[in-house]
Amino acid sequence: MTFDYARRYMPEDQTGKTTVVGNMVAGMCAGVAESVLVLTPGENLKTRLIDDRAGARLYQSSTHAIRTIVTKDGASTFFRGVLPVTLKQSNSSMVRFTSYNQLAPMLQPTCGVSTSVVAGALAGVITVYCTMPFDNVKTQMQSLDGSRIYSSSWDCAKKLVVNGGPRRLWKGTTPRLLRLSVAGAIAFTLYEEVVRLTGFLVLPKVAAKAPKDAA
């Protein structure tokens, strides 16, 4: 919904379609909203729980983990690593939506009814390679020892490259590639089907206000 809402305010080309830049900006807006409101708190909690199960066993449940983290470290802990998450998610949404909206019209004559599946899968592949470094930095920053080892997201990225080479930033690409290509195919197919059946997601463009006549 954020993407469609933001796209209402984006410029159109001569055919009445949102421009490439418009799709990119709308995608980034969707990514920022998703990152700040949902992903960063959720990813911090998930990473803490995974690390805890492999180590000290400080948390009895998700609810207990939330209470303990807020009491001990403050609510701001849930937004630790918000910069790399936002960079990753805004870029991810920008690449995913822009790629899909560029690929779908090109593939339509060849793929027909399968266009959304193929375009969604390809958009997922492109997204993985463009955003994997942000994902690896985010994961390292949100680990239990992240705040002790790394002073910033940039410091984390530098240490990953120094210790493992540039390829370290793309570690774990293959499993994520499989996951996002399948997820992209399913998500965009469902999205297009919902739009086709209901039409409620396609919001009208905001018309420009005509200037008032001079008195």
UniProtKB/Swiss-Prot annotation:
Homology family: Belongs to the mitochondrial carrier (TC 2.A.29) family.
Pathway: Mycotoxin biosynthesis
TM region(s), chain numbering: 19-39, 112-132, 182-202
Gene3D superfamilies: Mitochondrial carrier domain
Pfam families: Mito_carr
Keywords assigned: Membrane, Mitochondrion, Mitochondrion inner membrane, Repeat, Transmembrane, Transmembrane helix, Transport
Molecular function terms, GO-annotated: citrate secondary active transmembrane transporter activity
GO cellular component: mitochondrial inner membrane
InterPro entries cross-referenced by the UniProt entry: Mitochondrial_sb/sol_carrier, Mt_carrier_dom_sf, TXTP-like
Presence of keyword Membrane: yes
Gene label: ALT9
SUPFAM superfamilies: Mitochondrial carrier (SSF103506)
Membrane topology value: Multi-pass membrane protein
Principal subcellular localization: mitochondrion
Function description: Tricarboxylate transporter; part of the gene cluster that mediates the biosynthesis of the host-selective toxins (HSTs) AAL-toxins, sphinganine-analog mycotoxins responsible for Alternaria stem canker on tomato by the tomato pathotype. ALT1 also selectively transfers methyl groups at the first and the third cycle of chain elongation for AAL toxin.
Protein name per its UniProtKB record: Tricarboxylate transporter ALT9
Segments annotated as Solcar repeats: 18-106, 111-197
Note from the entry: Gene clusters encoding host-selective toxins (HSTs) are localized on conditionally dispensable chromosomes (CDCs), also called supernumerary chromosomes, where they are present in multiple copies. The CDCs are not essential for saprophytic growth but controls host-selective pathogenicity.
Superkingdom of source: Eukaryota
Subcellular location(s) of the protein: Mitochondrion inner membrane
UniProt key word Mitochondrion: yes
